[in-house]
């Protein structure tokens, strides 16, 4: 069931709720862990994240596809909407990560993210490789992504559901979402290739990566064992040194997150059609 080609430490602490409150346990290195659940379209992420959340007592944060104003447009005219949609999704996923991080700090509780700001790159890179995002547009995207990632910790755990693209296509056809029916196999295969590169990146960053063969789904209890039988470091390989600073207070970090969320509300670049190098029609932000 499991392929462990990219494997390292995950928490073996079965007690998911810390006893101490923020006021008494206020050092950054007392975080509960952050898990990101990744995989191709229709790999089974949402179902598994919900089940793991229930069993671990973790809060689940879903990706913002339900409110994506560009998704159906992208599937119909990918070259027109690729960059603007990826910048919108990058912004939304960053905001979701900030919310999850703040929740974990305030509640001393682990969190699971169904996709993340980290894996947003997979979709952008796939669009770039297919010629849907120009080199200049991709450079712009990466500059935004780098800025976002510099403000957040690296996830403790990266769970990847490894599903053959043909199987993903079959599941897409079976769930019959209108906006997805035009997705070609080549697009899913491209995402699969980009995800493999992404996992190497996450390993190099210091996240704890487990690859799960999910072609026939799997036993959730075995997934739990994989998580609980390993150890994890708090943010020892973080993008930002403050997550490793034992003297940095949780309340200060929460304040930093709030400030960043407020800053994000003021950012309009992700909807700025003037910077879209694919000559998209102007959409009001």
From Swiss-Prot:
Pfam families given in the database record: dNK
Protein's job: Purine-specific deoxyribonucleoside kinase that phosphorylates preferentially deoxyguanosine, as part of the deoxyribonucleotide salvage pathway.
Disulfide bond annotation, renumbered to this chain: none
Gene3D superfamilies: P-loop containing nucleotide triphosphate hydrolases
One term of GO molecular function: ATP binding
Catalytic residues as annotated in Swiss-Prot or TrEMBL: 114 (proton acceptor)
One Gene Ontology CC term in the entry: cytoplasm
Single biological process term from Gene Ontology: deoxyguanosine salvage
Family statement: Belongs to the DCK/DGK family.
Keywords linked to the UniProt accession: ATP-binding, Cytoplasm, Kinase, Nucleotide-binding, Transferase
Binding site for ATP: 39-47
Main localization of the protein described in the UniProt heading: cytoplasm
Secretion signal span: none
EC number: 2.7.1.113
InterPro entries to which the protein is assigned, alphabetical: DCK/DGK, Deoxyribonucleoside_kinase, DNK_dom, P-loop_NTPase
Catalytic activity: 2'-deoxyguanosine + ATP = dGMP + ADP + H(+)
Protein name: Deoxyguanosine kinase
Annotated substrate binding sites: 63, 75, 86, 115, 120, 180
Subcellular location: Cytoplasm
């Amino acid at each position: 069931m499991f392929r462990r080609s990219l494997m390292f430490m995950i928490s073996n602490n079965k007690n998911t709720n810390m006893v101490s409150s923020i006021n008494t346990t206020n050092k950054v290195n007392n975080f509960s862990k952050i898990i990101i659940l990744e995989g191709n379209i229709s790999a089974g992420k949402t179902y598994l994240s919900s089940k793991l959340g229930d069993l671990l007592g973790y809060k689940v944060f879903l990706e913002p596809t339900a409110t994506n104003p560009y998704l159906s447009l992208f599937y119909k005219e990918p070259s027109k909407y690729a960059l603007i949609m990826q910048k919108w999704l990058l912004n939304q996923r960053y905001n979701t990560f900030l919310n999850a991080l703040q929740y974990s700090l305030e509640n001393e509780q682990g969190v699971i993210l169904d996709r993340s700001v980290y894996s947003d790159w997979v979709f952008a890179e796939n669009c770039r490789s297919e010629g849907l995002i120009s080199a200049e547009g991709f450079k712009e995207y990466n500059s935004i992504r780098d800025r976002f990632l510099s403000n957040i910790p690296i996830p403790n755990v990266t769970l990847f559901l490894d599903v053959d693209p043909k199987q993903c296509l079959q599941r897409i056809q079976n769930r019959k979402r209108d906006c997805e029916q035009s997705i070609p196999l080549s697009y899913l295969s491209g995402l699969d290739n980009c995800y493999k590169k992404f996992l190497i990146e996450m390993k190099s960053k210091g996240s704890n990566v487990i690859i799960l063969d999910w072609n026939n789904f799997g036993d959730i209890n075995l997934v739990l064992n994989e998580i609980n039988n390993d150890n994890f470091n708090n943010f020892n390989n973080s993008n930002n040194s403050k997550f490793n600073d034992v003297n940095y207070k949780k309340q200060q970090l929460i304040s930093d997150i709030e400030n960043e969320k407020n800053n994000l509300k003021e950012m309009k670049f992700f909807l700025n059609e003037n910077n879209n190098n694919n000559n998209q029609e102007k959409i009001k932000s």
